[in-house]
Swiss-Prot record:
Dimethylallyl diphosphate binds at R101, K189, T190, Q228, K245, K254. Catalyzes the sequential condensation of isopentenyl pyrophosphate with the allylic pyrophosphates, dimethylallyl pyrophosphate, and then with the resultant geranylpyrophosphate to the ultimate product farnesyl pyrophosphate. InterPro entries: FPS1-like, Isoprenoid_synthase_dom_sf, Polyprenyl_synt, Polyprenyl_synt_CS. It is an enzyme of class 2 (transferase). The lineage of its organism: Eukaryota, Viridiplantae, Streptophyta, Embryophyta, Tracheophyta. This is Farnesyl pyrophosphate synthase 2. Mg(2+) 2 binds at D92, D96. It comes from Cannabis sativa. Its EC number is 2.5.1.10, 2.5.1.1. The gene is FPPS2. Pathway: Isoprenoid biosynthesis; farnesyl diphosphate biosynthesis; farnesyl diphosphate from geranyl diphosphate and isopentenyl diphosphate: step 1/1; Sesquiterpene biosynthesis; Isoprenoid biosynthesis; geranyl diphosphate biosynthesis; geranyl diphosphate from dimethylallyl diphosphate and isopentenyl diphosphate: step 1/1. Isopentenyl diphosphate binds at K46, R49, Q85, R102.
Length: 341
């Protein structure tokens, strides 16, 4: 059985445990609601974050075959990250008034769900400590795991806040957009939970103290930033069929890497055009912004950024004293370098 199928098996086991949690007396209706909500929101993505906990742990263990227990526990931690992601996305979609997610309507758009989705988000968040309690309570690193998830959740919610208050309607001001602001949003909103958390889970399970791995955290945050810049680029220049969504960063007045880069190199004339059309939902405005991006050769600017970042990350990774840790970081970098989706 391949790793992904094994990973899915663990999902069904965890789901079944949550639907029979002794702390709450379920009715048939409530059990059915939670089950549908979980199936709709948790396992639908690429599962990269979750699977990389298993990968990373195996590499840290020198690549030797994992025991059944190790596979189960690393999978359970991987699913905790997927639960965290589901919780963020369900609430995020309500805040952004989004239409689709992973090729289906956002959960709150499903008939009968509506704003019940807000409570479903809270439930998803509360499932994480239930899973951790059931499977890790006896472990020496139990408190470290709770701490780690709490801290990363706080960082992500704070990153989301910066993102939201930066794009408040009626306060649209492009001049406040800069590389430092872009990096701050990305670091907190995406990099901690998508890049640092999976590796941190593997390190904790392997008996490592996270305080000794600040350098690893910094490299992963840089990698997360690089990943988000790719995302910003693909939002505009990627093919919707390939990336699985239609990009709306321009319409949404997002603090995208592209607009920040554009602001650094525009003439006064071009700047006026950008200020006038960025953040407008009409097709003509979006087209004008995209044409400006082409004129400024942001595709070339991105290609330069991509190769420079790649070299810089590789150099940082190779400076790490532990070969296993290097291998974990290199496998992460290989997965995202020059990705198309």
């Amino acid at each position: 059985m391949d790793l992904k199928s094994k990973f899915m098996e663990v999902y069904y086991k965890l789901k079944s445990e949550l639907l029979n949690d002794p702390a709450f007396e379920f009715t048939d209706d409530s059990r059915q609601w939670v089950e549908q909500m979980l199936d709709y929101n948790v396992p639908g993505g690429k599962l990269n974050r979750g699977l990389s906990v298993i990968d990373s742990y195996q590499i840290l263990k020198g690549g030797k075959e994992l025991t059944e227990e190790e596979i189960f526990l690393t999978s359970a931690l991987g699913w905790c990250i997927e639960w965290l992601q589901a919780y963020f996305l369900v609430l995020d979609d309500i805040m952004d008034n989004s239409v689709t997610r992973r090729g289906q309507p956002c959960w709150f758009r499903v008939p009968k769900v509506g704003l019940i989705a807000a409570n479903d988000g809270i439930l998803l968040r509360n499932h994480i400590p239930r899973i951790l309690k059931k499977h890790f309570k006896g472990k020496s690193y139990y408190v470290d795991l709770l701490d780690l998830f709490n801290e990363v959740e706080f960082q992500t919610a704070s990153g989301q806040m910066i993102d939201l208050i930066t794009t408040i309607e009626g306060e649209k001001d492009l001049s406040k957009y800069s590389i430092p602001l872009h990096h701050r949003i990305v670091q907190y909103k995406t990099a901690y939970y998508s890049f640092y958390l999976p590796v941190a889970c593997a390190l904790v399970m392997a008996g490592e103290n996270l305080d000794n791995h600040v350098d690893v955290k910094n490299i992963l945050i840089e990698m997360g930033t690089y990943f988000q810049v790719q995302d910003d680029y693909l939002d505009c220049f990627g093919h919707p069929d390939v990336i699985g969504k239609i990009g709306t960063d321009i319409e949404d007045f997002k603090c995208s890497w592209l607009v920040v880069k554009a602001l650094e190199i525009v003439t006064d004339e071009q700047k006026k055009l950008l200020f006038e059309h960025y953040g407008k939902a009409d097709e003509a405005s979006v087209k004008k912004v995209k044409e400006l991006y082409k004129t400024l050769d942001l595709e070339g600017v991105f290609a330069d950024y991509e190769s420079t970042s790649y070299q810089k990350l590789n150099k940082s990774i190779e400076a790490h004293p532990k070969k296993e840790v290097q291998a974990v970081l290199k496998s992460f970098l290989a997965k995202i370098y020059k990705r198309q989706k």
